[in-house]
Every structure is written in C-alpha cells, then in structure tokens.
Amino acid sequence: MCTSIVYSSNNHHYFGRNLDLEISFGEHPVITPRNYEFQYRKLPNKKAKYAMVGMAIVEDNYPLYFDASNEEGLGIAGLNFDGPCHYFPEVSGKNNVTPFELIPYLLSQYTTVAEVKEALKSVNLVKINFSEKLQLSPLHWLMADKTGESIVVESTLSGLHVYDNPVHVLTNNPEFPGQLSNLANYSNIAPSQPKNTLVPGVDLNLYSRGLGTHFLPGGMDSASRFVKVAFVRAHSPQGNNELSSVTNYFH
C-alpha cells in the first residue's frame, strides 16, 4: 500500500510517501551527484544537471529509485498501479524511456512541474525490464515542485496521461480521474459539527465531537485512503516552525 502527499505550510512544501509492504527490497537512501552519467536503454547517455536523493536499490551501479527529490525541489514518487497500468513497445520519434528510468530521466534535467509536463509530451514509457531478475513494476507517479504544484502521470492502454492534481495526494487504483470523481460522494464531510438537516427544529444531541467526519472512510483500501488523506491534508493546521510542520506531515 502506498500513499503520497504534498503538504504546504507557511510557504514551505513537504513531499513524501509511505511504502507499506510486508517485505523489504533492501531499499535505502541513495544520493546521485551532479554530472553522474545515466545510461538509458533507448536514449543516449546523459549527465545529470542536478543531484538527487531518495529511496532506491542499486543494481549494476544504477539507482532504481522508488522516490526521490532533486536539489531544486522537484520530487517524484512511484506508487503501485497494478491493473490499469500499461507500458508500450518502442515508438519511433518518441523519447522511449523505461519506467525504471523515469525518475532519474526527469529529476536529473528539470526543476519544475511545468518543465516536466512539457518534457512528457514526447515520452513513451517503453516496456523493457531492467533485467531478467528485476521485472518492471506497474506504477503511476506523483510529481511536485517547490511551489507545491503537483501532477499525476499514468500510462494506461489509452496512452500516457498527465493530470493536474488539485488535491495533492495519490494512492493506488483506480485511475486518477476516478479517484477525483469518488470524492464527490464524501463532499458533505467536514471537520466541524454537522448542521441538523435531517429533522430541522428538533434539538438533536450531538453526542460526540467529530460527527462531521462520521462517514469518512476508514478502510486501508486505496480508494478509502485517497478520500481520507485528501480530507486530512486539506484540513491539517499549518505548523508554526519547521519541526511542527514536519510533525504535522507525518501525522
């Protein structure tokens, strides 16, 4: 289970994710310095303009990032997207990037979401495994920059899609437009006590604080997590310093 959030507090922006699995892949913090030359399967080798740091495993001296941010504040997290995810054969005239190359391909060269959106117009996510042992993972990506702007990138049977992300969160399935549409089912949820519209004029006993969240999903499934984290992020207080902001983020 994966959940990723872009949290803003006092003109600072915090980016991260969790990876709740019962196994470990041996991932650990990995720094890739400026001028490191990335080798691409279908593109010329290219040196990194920007350093990056994130969680990765390293195979054959190549960092396979789960998520990372570069020195200019651009961050990307890859989350499980099993089912809708679809990668493609090589396409002539496109920049054919394998999914495991996407994070370094973008973080090594770009600094803003606007630049990434422009670069993705010419990208085809090509179905090439890293190795026989390391097969491709079905992923979609949350990307955000230091302004707090964020997008979601999904490769499905209908092509590569780039969505502006007004709620600045991402979980897993279904496809991002479906996750946004589902939020309408919970639009009456509020952090305040509800107004009695059931039987107006009757003095109902609001027996507990938090009744405005009574129908907030509590499941660990991806659709429930999306609703819950979108609500919590939207109503989280801003920290009055960096420590309190980081604490709020982890909550």
PLM features per residue range, with description:
Residues 113, 117-153:
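Aromatic- and glycine-enriched pocket-lining scaffold segments that form the walls
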Residues 8-11, 70-72, 145-148, 154-159:
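Short acidic-glycine loop/turn motifs at beta-strand connectors
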Residues 3-94, 127:
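A contiguous strand-loop segment
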Residues 24-42, 160-189:
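A short, surface-exposed interaction/processing loop segment used at functional sites
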